[in-house]
């Protein structure tokens, strides 16, 4: 009985001790400026811009004992409030609409991943990945 009590106290002490370390190493879920690429099928260039996206740590719990009858929901850092902006891609042929709309994060939240607004994959392409030739927003080529 005493061993169980001491083990509980040690666990509690470690949680209190490590809490500031964990908090300082992991950024909270919040909007951050990120370089992203905008491209469209049929247009020869990829426009690289800076825009706020949601990024950061969300507390999640993985159950020790997994049951086939229970569902585990993992929370991710995703958009709470979002505004959409439209930009014109350069050098698109006349038959391709050169406009691309992208989300701008106004605020973020730890919640279930919404496939309509977020990339919920484990390993995805970087946000500034381009298939076509890259162009910076100030006109410089990469």
From Swiss-Prot:
Q: Which UniProt keywords apply?
A: Disulfide bond, Glycoprotein, Hormone, Secreted, Signal
The primary site where this protein sits is: secreted
Q: Does the keyword Secreted apply?
A: yes
Name which cysteines form disulfide bonds: 29-77, 43-92, 46-130, 54-108, 58-110, 113-120
Check the record and name the PANTHER family matching this protein.
GLYCOPROTEIN HORMONE BETA CHAIN, LUTROPIN SUBUNIT BETA
Q: Organism, per UniProt?
A: Oncorhynchus keta
Q: Does the UniProt entry include the keyword Nucleotide-binding?
A: no
PROSITE patterns in the cross-refs: GLYCO_HORMONE_BETA_1, GLYCO_HORMONE_BETA_2
Family that this chain belongs to: Belongs to the glycoprotein hormones subunit beta family.
The record's subcellular locations are: Secreted
Q: What does this protein do?
A: Involved in gametogenesis and steroidogenesis.
One GO CC term on file? cytoplasm
Q: Name one GO biological process term.
A: G protein-coupled receptor signaling pathway
Q: Which GO terms describe its molecular function?
A: hormone activity
Share what the entry says about its subunit structure, partners included.
Heterodimer of an alpha and a beta chain.
Write the protein's name.
Gonadotropin subunit beta-2
The glycosylation sites annotated in the UniProt record are 33
Signal sequence interval, chain numbering: 1-23
């Amino acid at each position: 009985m005493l061993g169980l009590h001491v083990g509980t106290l040690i666990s509690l002490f470690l949680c209190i001790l490590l809490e500031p370390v964990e908090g300082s190493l992991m950024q909270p879920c919040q909007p951050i400026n990120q370089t992203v690429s905008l491209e469209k099928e049929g247009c020869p260039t990829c426009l690289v811009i800076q825009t706020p996206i949601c990024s950061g740590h969300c507390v999640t719990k993985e159950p020790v004992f997994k049951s086939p009858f229970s569902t585990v929901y993992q929370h991710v850092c995703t958009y709470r409030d979002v505004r959409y902006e439209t930009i014109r891609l350069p050098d698109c042929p006349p038959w391709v609409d050169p406009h691309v709309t992208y989300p701008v994060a106004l605020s973020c939240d730890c919640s279930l991943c919404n496939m309509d607004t977020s990339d919920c994959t484990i390993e995805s392409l970087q946000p500034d990945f381009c298939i076509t030739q890259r162009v910076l927003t100030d006109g410089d080529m990469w």
